[in-house]
From Swiss-Prot:
Keywords: Antimicrobial, Disulfide bond, Ion channel impairing toxin, Myotoxin, Neurotoxin, Potassium channel impairing toxin, Secreted, Signal, Toxin, Voltage-gated potassium channel impairing toxin. Cationic peptide that possesses multiple functions. It acts as a cell-penetrating peptide (CPP), and as a potent voltage-gated potassium channel (Kv) inhibitor. It exhibits antimicrobial activities, hind limb paralysis, and severe muscle necrosis by a non-enzymatic mechanism. This is Crotamine CRO3. It is found in: Secreted. Belongs to the crotamine-myotoxin family. It comes from Crotalus durissus terrificus. Residues 1-22 form the signal peptide. Expressed by the venom gland. Its main location: secreted. Gene3D superfamilies: Anthopleurin-A. It comes from the Eukaryota.
Length: 64
């Protein structure tokens, strides 16, 4: 029972820290969006960088 609680706590701890997951993208002032989203203007599309698979980095507020 204790192991289940410990696992749940650690899992939630990792989920609650999304800002630390994509440091390269965030350093450019960006945020990770699904690859299908369009970054506006196109110059705000930083590419994949360190976002997860099939996601890309866009300047914050540009994902539409």
């Amino acid at each position: 029972m204790i192991l289940y609680l410990l696992f749940a706590f650690l899992f939630l701890a990792f989920l609650s820290e999304p800002g630390n997951a994509y440091k390269q993208c965030h350093k450019k002032g960006g945020h990770c969006f699904p690859k299908e989203k369009i970054c506006i203007p196109p110059s705000s599309d930083f590419g994949k960088m360190d976002c997860r698979w099939r996601w890309k980095c866009c300047k914050k507020g540009s994902g539409k």
